[in-house]
Amino acid sequence: MGKQGLNIGLIGTGNMGGEIARIAPEKGHNIVAAFNRNRPLSEDSFNEEIDVCIDFSCPECVVNNVCMLANWGVPLVLGTTGWTARFAEVRAQVISSEMAIVHAPNFSIGVAVYLRIVREAGTLFNQLPDYDVFVHESHHRRKVDSPSGTALAL
């Protein structure tokens, strides 16, 4: 990357996509293409300027997006949740194409630390048969996936 930022293809222009579009230029990166339900990723939408795609779209779109980007040789940061029922299919595509991909249910450093703490707590609670652990989450009314990918990771 050096001093020049990345040229980003943004897949999904909802809440997270909007935040990425807002923050990327502040960090020196360029949004060179944006895809959404009205303008989905397709063979006709290839843009050779794209260095990496960031996907916060919908679970139903993930397999198509991964296949398309693998064919183009474009790395992917995947933040979309709710698609893991098709994990084996995505994994096979990634392996066969040697695609570069990073995926997580949540990219927050705070959540990453919290997940590690929860793992440790789980080990301790497993030794206490009188305790049942559960997760309760609440969100704004427009939250699309419930339970969230973060809650499922916990």
Q: Which stretches of residues belong to each language-model region?
A:
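Short, acidic/turn-prone active-site loops that include or flank metal/cofactor-
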Residues: 36-40, 80-84, 107
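Short, hydrophobic beta-strand segments that form beta-sheet elements in well-ordered domains
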Residues: 10, 31-37, 53-55
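Rossmann-fold dehydrogenase core element
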Residues: 75, 90-108, 128-135
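Glycine-rich adenosine-cofactor-binding loop
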Residues: 7-20, 110
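Conserved anion/nucleotide-ligand pocket segment
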Residues: 113-154
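NAD(P)-binding Rossmann-fold cofactor-contacting core
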Residues: 19, 23-43
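Rossmann-fold NAD(P)-binding glycine/threonine-rich loop
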Residues: 80-103, 112-121
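Rossmann-fold NAD(P) dinucleotide-binding segment
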Residues: 46, 52, 56-80, 87-93
